[in-house]
Each structure stands twice: as C-alpha cells, then as structure tokens.
A protein has these predicted regions:
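Short alpha-helical patches at coil-to-helix transitions and adjacent helical residues
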Residues: 20, 24, 91, 155, ...
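Conserved nucleotide- and phosphate/pyrophosphate-binding catalytic cores
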Residues: 157, 163-353
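N-terminal Rossmann-like or analogous alpha/beta NTP/dinucleotide-binding catalytic cores
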Residues: 2-139, 257, 296-298, 305-306
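Extreme N-terminus of proteins, especially the signal/transit-peptide cleavage junction
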Residues: 1-3, 346-347
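Internal, conserved structured core segments that host functional sites
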Residues: 111-115, 119-169, 173, 194-195
Length: 353
C-alpha cells in the first residue's frame, strides 16, 4: 500500500504560528523525510464557505494568502500536491454518499463541532454545510486514500469520525476505503498553542494570533502584550510557568542554541523556568527572549513569502496543476465507491439490463 498524506487549511485568513507548530512544520518534515509516496495539501475553500457563504470574496482572497504561507514554510510543489478543494468536484459527491452513514446525533456529539458552534454562536442557526463539516473532511481524506493525516489536537475528533465512516462503509459495501492514521506533533506544547490573550485556542476569528507573515515590529508588539501569570506582579515574585502562554510558546519554539545566542545567562529552558518559578526574573526579560526566538524562526519564513509574493503567476500555476492532479486521484476513488454502491449503472458488468 502506498503511504499517502492528506492535510490542509481553510482559507479564512493568513496562517498563524498555531498552524505552524500544530501541523505545518510537521508537514514539511514529513514531506522531506522521503517516507511518503504521495502528499496532498488542500486549501479547503468549500469548507470555508460553510460559515462564510455571504462573503465568498473573503475566501477567494485568502486562497493565495494560504498558498503563500505554505510555500514560505517550505512546502515544495515538486514533492507535495497543493490544490483547491472546490476544483475537485468528486469530493462533494463522496460527501453526499457518506452522509447516509452518519446520524445527526453522532455529528452533534463531535467535540470539535460542539466547540466551533459555541465559538461562532450558531446554536440553532447553524448552516447545514458547516454541521456536516466532519463528513466533508472524511471525503477529503478518503478521496486520496490517505494513510497519514498530520493534525493539531483540536482536529482529533474529526479524524476519529472519519475512521468511523471508513469502517462503516467497508463493513457494509466491502473493503473500499483506506483507514487513515493520525499524526500529532511530538512536542506536547505544539498540540494546541494558546492565543496571546491567554485564551485556550489561537484563532483568526478571536484576533489573538501571531501571523506567519507579520512583520518583525508587529510580532514584537504582540509578544510584549502577551498574557502571563497574573500573580507575577513584581520581578522578585515567584512566577507560574504552567499555563503561562509565554512559556508555552517557548516550549513550542525554543532550542538550546538560542540561549547561547540570545540569553547566555541560561543553558536551557529548564533553567529559565526554574529562575522564574523561584522569583527574580521579570516578564519583560522573558518576553524579549521569546521575541528573539520567534524572529529566528519566522524571519526566514517571512523572507521566502516576500519572494513568492513577487511570483504570483507562478503560484496560480502551482495551484492549477495541483488541482488537476488531485482531481484525477479523487476520480479513481469515486469510481471505486460507485462500484461498491452498485450505482455505476452504465459500466461493464454492472450495466443496467
């Protein structure tokens, strides 16, 4: 069996550092490992329209922004197929067939769906398309016969529901779909990066993000305004590192070599945490260090993005070529699904009498 990756993002805005540590950096690592036969990276515009139906121009504008972020982070179109979801109509048809295998009650129990509904204040006014998001995602994953899906922690319930659909389909219609496996970031701090305001999730809609494309001065301003331990009022006060966004970001981004370069008074992050916990280390000093760490990580990404911004026609070509490759792959799976459902009425031995 081929080893295949499928992953992607909704084009509702530029990508942020939560995307980077939660999934993007892992995609680049897996892409460059040479361990996978095919890699598909989807710009999920159709899914983005489920809660932006009245503002399609927002989705359209952000397709290029997301593509630029992908390329800037190191996604290589020679190794990975970058495509636009709506350019692969087979995904919509697969979604429709899978809907028959899932109950409304099951979708309502999906923790990701529940949290997204609450965050957007949908309640009873939830669009049907948004409600069916987990089923659409299952179509995306199975269409490319993905064996591996690198995701952030918040997407785990979606992948679990996809696996349920795969098992149900295969048990009813015969072995047809590939059962995907989840890959989470190895660094636990990367599972879910909090917002700079200390809220549980960094989110474009909450406005608490550091974007990959933010200029250095913007990143610095955001870092210096970050939420920390509210009880750490004076430098000499003992501070708390658990749940402290500044230290969570350092857990996610910091490398030992950054101490030698930016903060030689400490050997590693454990020493810095120890000092903060016993008192005598101010938030400003820690934030300044975090800002230098982020600049070391984001600076090269920002420069590559600026280079690609000068090559927008090439970015369009990459997306068009990738979408064509993706459609061919999805068409193969859809044909197998139709055959399993016995609805390929005019094909060979299955033709209507």
């Amino acid at each position: 069996m081929k080893k295949v990756i499928l992953t992607g993002d909704r084009p509702t805005g530029r990508l942020h550092v939560g995307h980077y540590v939660g999934s993007l950096s892992e995609r680049v690592r897996l892409q460059n490992s040479g361990d996978y036969d095919e890699i598909y990276i989807m710009i999920a515009d159709a899914q983005a329209l489920t809660d932006n139906a009245e503002h399609p121009e927002k989705v359209r504008q952000n397709i290029i922004q997301v593509a630029l972020d992908y390329l800037a982070c190191g996604i290589d179109p020679e190794k990975s197929t970058i495509f636009i979801q709506s350019m692969v109509p087979e995904l919509t048809e697969l979604t429709f067939y899978y809907m028959n295998l899932v109950t409304v009650a099951r979708v309502q129990r999906n923790p990701t769906v529940k949290s997204e509904i609450k965050m957007r204040n949908f309640e009873a006014s939830i669009p049907v398309g948004f409600f069916c998001y987990p089923i659409s995602q299952a179509a995306d994953i199975t269409a490319f016969r993905a064996t591996t899906v690198p995701v952030g922690e918040d997407q785990m319930p979606m992948i679990e529901q996809c696996k349920e659909i795969v098992h149900k389909f295969n048990s009813v219609y015969g072995e047809t779909l590939t059962d995907p496996q989840i890959v989470l970031p190895s660094n636990k701090a990367c599972l879910r990066l909090p917002g700079i305001d200390g809220k549980a999730k960094m989110s474009k809609s909450l406005g608490n993000c550091i974007y990959l494309s933010d200029e250095a001065d913007v990143v610095k301003k955001k870092v210096m305004s970050m939420f920390t331990d509210p009880n750490h009022l004076r430098v000499q006060d003992p501070g708390k590192v658990e749940g402290n966004p500044v230290f969570i970001y350092l857990d996610a981004f910091c490398k030992d070599e950054y101490f030698a370069e930016f903060l030689p008074d400490y050997q590693n992050l454990d020493e810095l945490k120890e000092h903060y916990q016993r008192g005598g280390l101010g938030d400003v000093k820690v934030k300044k260090f975090l800002n230098k760490v982020l600049e070391a990580e984001l600076g090269p990404i920002r420069e590559r993005r600026k280079m690609w911004e000068q090559r927008i026609p090439d970015v369009y070509d990459i997306l068009q070529a990738g979408s064509e490759v993706a459609e061919k792959k999805a068409a193969e799976t859809l044909n197998d699904v139709r055959e399993a459902l016995k609805i390929n009425y005019f094909d060979g031995d299955f033709a209507l009498n």
